[in-house]
Amino acid sequence: MNRFKKVFFIILPLLFLSGCFLSKNKEEKTKDTQKEVIEVEKRPITNRIDIKSATYASDIILDKLSKSEDKAYEVTKINNLSQIESLNFDIAVVPAYQVVDLYNKTNGNIKLAAITVLNNIHIISDKQINNPTEMAGKTIMVPELNESMNKLIDSKLGFVKTLMKINTEFYYSQKDIIKNLENSENIIAFLSEPYYSKAITNNNYYRFDVNEVISMIPNSKTESEGDFVSDVIIVNKNYLRDNKDSFDKFLAEYKNAQGEIKEGDVLSQGIINNYDITNEEAISIFKSMDNSFIDSDTMAGVFEIYLDKLENLDKNIFSGNRPSDDLYYKR
């Protein structure tokens, strides 16, 4: 029983440890340097800062910044990380769990500059689960993570999937999870905002607190207290090299805009269409989130604790490539 319990309560926080989902691009990327140079040359010539948005909260904040009078920011919503991996950006807001993978794939050519959202992790089920035996026959609905996370999930589930007839379904988009929830039973689903709020509207799902789940892991080395890092700002070193003042200005403006979002603000139609929610719902959900702005030494300390949590779940998760202090941008 203890073995089942340990596996169950490890996979709950693990499957969605970092919060908001962004799927990993599955297409093979070219290694032809000449082709990469040509692609860069085709980018339009502009003095505007190229910002990529990969999370819900950043979509709303950057929408506000993009409407500023000086038109300094060129904001693009992205659905995969291919442009980040090829360094085709100046600044980006991405899910925290992608940072180490991106750092290694870009040969260390990014820096982490700020933590902007915490605790965007939500676990729901249509049934109460009081002990591991009640996991039997359940379907776990999970947004697809990156390769290292997916391998970690499989290794933790192991033989229990077959023995307890647990079915794990990975989804390219949380939109698909929402659709399937409507006609599914005996499920556990992992969601981030705004999909979590959409799922629980008019539905009586049981909700699980991630920290409480972690505290139930027998002999766990992972601390059950503290916040989970969800959204972060990263910067391209090539841009940062000659634009430190400009980047510092962006960080200050992002922080200010984050605190200025209020009821009555009118969002761009693209956001409303993409998330299939009303303007009022979008603002309300944003305001309910744990929006924060942590930078410099405090950010580095918080993120190191986050990386420690991952390593305590699996000591080989970074395959010996855990970033050094060079990862952090400190003003």
Where are these regions (language model features)?
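Pocket-flanking alpha-helical
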Residues: I60-D63, K77-N109, I121-N130, D176-N180, ...
